[in-house]
């Protein structure tokens, strides 16, 4: 991630109303900042944790600062979901994602049906792939998980990916793990069983799933479903 104006260190006091957080900056001043994360931020919103803020020079903004990262469990965690798609798009174009090697074009916010869009359409190796991206900031016992709250919208996106595969298209669900204390990924069945079951169905139908960490060097993570270390479901 590129923060051309640098980041401001602070300490989290509380996160509330979904999009707001109170923090204490270095001189002891308490300010309210924008928190662009629609989830619960489970495992990454503990009071008194160190945080990093970016600052905007847009005079129309009510809150100049944005919460970008929080330090918990000995790692920095990216919580600004507004950056997720850009991180993945840049990684694809610079060749960091092996599955999309040779990518020549990345289109964003692709309409696939009335009232429904997916994040990316990638041209690579004489083919096109539709990609829906999910930011993952939650981890427990070294396993990253998504979602951290019930997500009807996320389930809808999986349905759209299934439709595309049935039409002969390539479709991917891409989980970006914005923390480095995880060795694998799995759906958070205990939080949203419908999403988890729909993800399993999507993989059975041919949707491909990827989980990558946002770190200095991106590396693939195994996806755990029903105790299997394969991204595909075990045969019944």
Swiss-Prot record:
Transmembrane segments: none annotated. GO terms for molecular function: DNA binding. InterPro entries: SfsA, SfsA_C, SfsA_N. Belongs to the SfsA family. This is Sugar fermentation stimulation protein homolog. It comes from Desulfotalea psychrophila (strain LSv54 / DSM 12343). The gene is sfsA.
